[in-house]
């Protein structure tokens, strides 16, 4: 008996339509299905679920290392930084990295 993979990652969002646009247009996800309060997209081979929840606190955790990491081709690293900046994505400072680590871009979605 084993867990074979992660089926999907679900994000709570305050506005489903603007979040769909962010994940489609900025992160280049493919929209699979969209309902009244839920949408599913794929980014690479990962399913991303967006679940609209308007009345929940969103700024309670401001210094957590909890995150999702996407993989990109190394040669596209600077292109992605430029793309995120051009689209006014909130790019975070990140954390100190060991020189042996791969490069990372830390950013938030529309809900932080």
Locate each region found by the language model.
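Short, conserved charged micro-motifs
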Residues: 18-19, 75-80
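Helix-adjacent hinge/juxtasegments
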Residues: 57-66, 71
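Conserved beta-strand in the GNAT
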Residues: 49-51, 106
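Vicinal oxygen chelate
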Residues: 81-112
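Core segments of cupin and vicinal oxygen chelate
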Residues: 11-49
């Amino acid at each position: 008996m084993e867990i074979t993979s992660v089926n999907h990652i679900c994000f709570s969002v305050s506005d489903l339509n603007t979040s769909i646009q962010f994940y489609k247009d900025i992160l280049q996800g493919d929209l699979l299905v969209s309902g009244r309060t839920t949408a599913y997209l794929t980014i690479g081979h990962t399913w991303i679920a967006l679940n609209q929840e308007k009345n929940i606190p969103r700024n309670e955790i401001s210094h957590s290392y909890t995150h999702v990491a996407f993989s990109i081709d190394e040669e596209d690293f600077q292109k992605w930084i430029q793309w995120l900046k051009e689209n006014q994505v909130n790019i975070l400072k990140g954390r100190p990295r060991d020189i042996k680590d791969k490069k990372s871009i830390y950013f938030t979605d529309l809900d932080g």
